[in-house]
């Protein structure tokens, strides 16, 4: 699943990030360092929208995926529609407040009319920027559920096209129509508006499980995914506080040019963040599925692959910036920067920290996929507030060059702190390990019956009664037999069987053949058998019996594999 879901994701992340930082790139070339500074002052506002977008999307999408894996489709759709409603409501309220209180917002960001040209450019940039942020919020909410349904590829393509369109429209508005910085924010607005509309239409007309309904989850069912989502997205609000403090420190230590340099470093960080986040976001649905299946072996394997991948990419891009720093000139056009070596130095120090940042972001996504909101919040808090701000304040005592070392120091210290906290929490955890049997094998009669014997012995040994053991064996034999009949010679099957405290059994089956629901055989051959046909199809009849004896049965073609989930309850 790593190669199918994750391998190409950094390319999409790089494309998205270049579009996201396109405003700074374009105004740097077209206007100058003052324009970069004007755009840079809005970094906290971008972080606020990111905080809301990921807080309202990720936690709910993970709960949606878990409910689907448990066969609870109606409850899952209620979660989806509840968070869609909350997201759309938020996307109306926030820009309305920003537009009503523009002067107050600019003052809060550290701008005043005394800043002259920078203030005027920032004021023209604001309206389309906040409108675009609202539609970006809606797009992210819808796309998070699409990734957790079965549309990872479409979601990545849509967001990449949105980013490229943003860049293209901004180029036209800035260089052809001479709209200045406002033209860049207009490109951000119109591209995200289109992406939100396309996302909604895709959900309406696609063959996935998602659908818009006027049926919502009760408040108590919404609170947990809210906590889970905002535990991670709190990094953006913490980041906004961190950015404000960093900007004020740079203003006191140096001048507006230092803020422009900081914005360049922040834009470089967006490339790394998007790259690492795309690895985390595309792997998160798979982590969530493995977690629901209690498949620790595959979950740990996927984590190792993603971790190695993140470290390799972080090191490679850091080496590129260090050996060939002129790439920063090509991106941002720094002709009016008094000393380009200041930017190169800051970028090199940030690059060292980015390697550890990749590890942190991946750890956040994996912890979130487990539903551990406390663990996620601990890591997020340590990165930005717990270590980030104290280290920044200490380094500011040693001058403007020293403050850039905050990037590697806060990442290393936060990872060390999170490791210590995780060890303490694990030592205090008293819950017993779940009884789980996981296996993967080439589907043939010999392998199947060998695994069935082992699974039956496993279930019986963990207190499952004889009747449930018989139903478990029957269901697996019939389902795998039907898959083998409709598959090719080298069908691979992955099984996960978990025995719960009440001695009920959860079963997850994944196979590698083309899209095929084994229970469609029962409908085609038995329930809808043509009149006059007396011959009984035993595979179809067997699947009917399995359907009768199982609960929470759900089939999905997910991440390129047929996935069946069901439950066998004690009578």
Range-by-range predicted roles:
Residues 1-6, 200-236, 425-439, 533:
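Interhelical loop/hinge segments that connect adjacent transmembrane helices in multipass membrane
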Residues 27-47, 116-121, 181-184, 224-228, ...:
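Interfacial/gating helices of multi-pass transporter permease domains
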Residues 36-96, 136-154, 262-319, 359-371, ...:
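Small-residue-rich hydrophobic transmembrane alpha-helices
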Residues 93-123, 127, 316-337, 344:
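Short membrane-interface helical motifs at transmembrane helix boundaries
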Residues 114-139, 337-360:
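Alpha-helical transmembrane segments of multi-pass membrane proteins
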Residues 153, 163-197, 325, 384-415:
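Membrane-interface helix-loop junctions in multi-pass transport and translocation proteins
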Residues 466-493, 548:
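Conserved ATP-binding N-box helix of the HATPase_c
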């Amino acid at each position: 699943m790593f190669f199918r879901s994750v391998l190409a994701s950094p390319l999409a992340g790089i494309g998205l990030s270049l579009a996201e930082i396109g405003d700074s790139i374009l105004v740097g070339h077209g206007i100058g360092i003052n324009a970069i500074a004007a755009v840079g002052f809005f970094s906290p506002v971008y972080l606020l929208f990111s905080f809301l977008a990921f807080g309202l999307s990720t936690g709910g999408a993970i709960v949606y995926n878990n409910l689907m894996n448990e066969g609870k489709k109606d409850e899952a759709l209620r979660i989806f529609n509840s968070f869609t409603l909350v997201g759309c409501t938020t996307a109306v309220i926030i820009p309305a407040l920003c537009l009503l209180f523009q002067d107050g917002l600019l003052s809060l960001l550290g701008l005043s009319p005394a800043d002259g040209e920078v203030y005027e450019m920032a004021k023209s940039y604001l309206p389309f920027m906040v409108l675009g942020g609202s539609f970006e919020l809606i797009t992210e909410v819808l796309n998070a559920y699409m990734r957790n349904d079965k549309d990872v590829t479409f979601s990545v393509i849509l967001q990449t096209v949105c980013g490229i369109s943003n860049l293209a429209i901004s180029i036209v508005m800035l260089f052809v129509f001479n709209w200045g910085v406002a033209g860049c924010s207009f490109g951000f607005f119109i591209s995200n508006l289109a992406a939100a509309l396309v996302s909604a239409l895709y959900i309406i007309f696609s063959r996935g499980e998602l659908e818009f309904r006027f049926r919502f989850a009760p408040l108590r069912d919404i609170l947990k995914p809210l906590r889970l989502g905002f535990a991670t997205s709190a990094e953006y609000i913490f980041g906004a506080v961190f950015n404000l403090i960093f900007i004020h420190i740079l203003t006191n230590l140096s001048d507006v040019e230092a803020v422009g340099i900081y914005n360049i470093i922040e834009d470089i960080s967006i490339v790394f963040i998007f790259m690492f986040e795309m690895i985390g976001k595309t792997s998160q649905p798979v982590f969530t599925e493995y977690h629901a299946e209690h498949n620790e072996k595959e979950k740990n394997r996927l984590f190792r692959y993603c971790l190695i991948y993140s470290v390799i990419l972080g090191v490679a891009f850091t080496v590129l910036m260090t050996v060939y720093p002129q790439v920063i000139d090509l991106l941002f056009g720094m002709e009016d920067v008094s000393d380009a070596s200041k930017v190169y130095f800051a970028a090199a120090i940030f690059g060292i920290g980015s390697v550890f940042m990749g590890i942190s972001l991946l750890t956040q996504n994996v912890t979130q996929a487990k539903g551990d909101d406390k663990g996620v919040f601990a890591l997020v808090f340590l990165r930005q507030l717990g270590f980030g701000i104290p280290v920044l304040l200490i380094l500011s005592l040693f001058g403007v060059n020293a403050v850039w070392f905050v990037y590697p120091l806060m990442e290393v210290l936060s990872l060390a702190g999170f490791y210590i906290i995780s060890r303490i929490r694990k030592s205090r955890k008293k819950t017993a390990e779940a009884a789980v049997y996981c296996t993967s094998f080439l589907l043939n009669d010999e392998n199947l019956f060998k695994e069935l014997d082992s699974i039956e012995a496993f279930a019986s040994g963990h207190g499952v009664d004889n009747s449930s053991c018989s139903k478990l064996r029957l269901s697996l034999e019939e389902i795998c037999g039907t898959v083998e009949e409709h598959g090719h010679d080298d069908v691979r099957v992955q099984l996960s069987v978990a025995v719960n405290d009440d001695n009920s059994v959860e079963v997850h089956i994944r196979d590698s053949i083309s899209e095929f629901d084994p229970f469609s055989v029962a409908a085609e051959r038995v329930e809808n058998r043509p009149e006059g046909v007396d011959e009984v199809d035993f595979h179809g009849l067997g699947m009917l019996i399995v359907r009768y004896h199982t609960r929470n049965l759900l089939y999905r073609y997910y991440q390129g594999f047929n996935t069946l989930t069901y439950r066998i309850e004690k009578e």
